[in-house]
Regions:
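Acidic helix-start/capping segments at beta-turn-to-alpha-helix junctions
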Residues: 79-94
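Solvent-exposed loop/turn segments at secondary-structure junctions
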Residues: 48-51, 85-88, 115-119, 153-156
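Surface-exposed short loop/turn segments
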Residues: 91-145
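Short secondary-structure boundary motifs at beta->alpha junctions and helix caps
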Residues: 126-132, 138-182
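Sec-dependent bacterial lipoprotein signal peptides
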Residues: 1-21
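Soluble non-cytosolic domains of exported or imported proteins
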Residues: 54-62, 91, 159-171
């Protein structure tokens, strides 16, 4: 009787563990027309996400900074714009971004949107933390789409530490950069 009860408790614990595991999924959305490797690339601030009809400010710019650092670590010449003309609060105008990139000597540009952002587990709400990012790569001369990739990472159903959703910046950026470089 006691060993049966122990087995049931162990099985339930194992199932609870499996159901609360985190996941990371990244894919190349379009076939690449040209590689970012060997090009001078500018990364515009990623557009801030919306949750329940409200824009969550302050997510897109730090996400773009981490993404830029991952590109640099992969050997890609990448920078953020020096102009404050572009902000994560507004969707980047493609034509304006292409002009800015071409005028400043960049051969490619990356525009991104944080498509999903949920901070839940840190509040013990039973809601899973989620971050999702979609990026598009354009040629600065023609403004033609060269590639696009997206990724989504979700946390566990619970957490034992106060770990904000910003913890997904690094792994999600790294995997999307890997997808763009393949």
């Amino acid at each position: 009787m006691r060993s049966t009860l122990l087995r049931i408790v162990a099985l339930l614990g194992y199932l609870f563990f499996l159901s609360s595991c985190a996941g990371l999924d990244v894919k190349l959305d379009t076939a690449k027309k040209s590689s970012i490797k060997g090009n001078r690339v500018i990364i515009f601030p990623f557009y801030d996400p919306f949750y329940r009809g409200r824009q969550i400010q302050g997510v897109g710019e730090p996400f773009a900074t981490v993404f830029t650092n991952k590109l640099l670590a992969a050997g890609v010449s990448a920078e953020l714009p020096k102009s404050r003309e572009f902000s994560s609060l507004n969707m980047v105008d493609i034509e304006k971004a292409c002009r800015y990139a071409a005028d400043n000597g960049y051969t490619m540009l990356i525009i991104g949107v944080v498509t999903e952002w949920i901070e839940g587990a840190t509040n013990w709400s039973g809601t899973v933390d989620v971050a999702a990012l979609s990026v598009k790569v354009y040629s600065s001369k023609t403004c033609e789409l060269s590639a696009s990739a997206s990724g989504r990472e979700n946390g566990t159903w619970f957490t034992f530490v106060n770990a904000p959703t910003t913890r997904f910046f690094e792994p999600l950026s790294e995997k999307i950069v890997e997808a763009l470089l393949k």
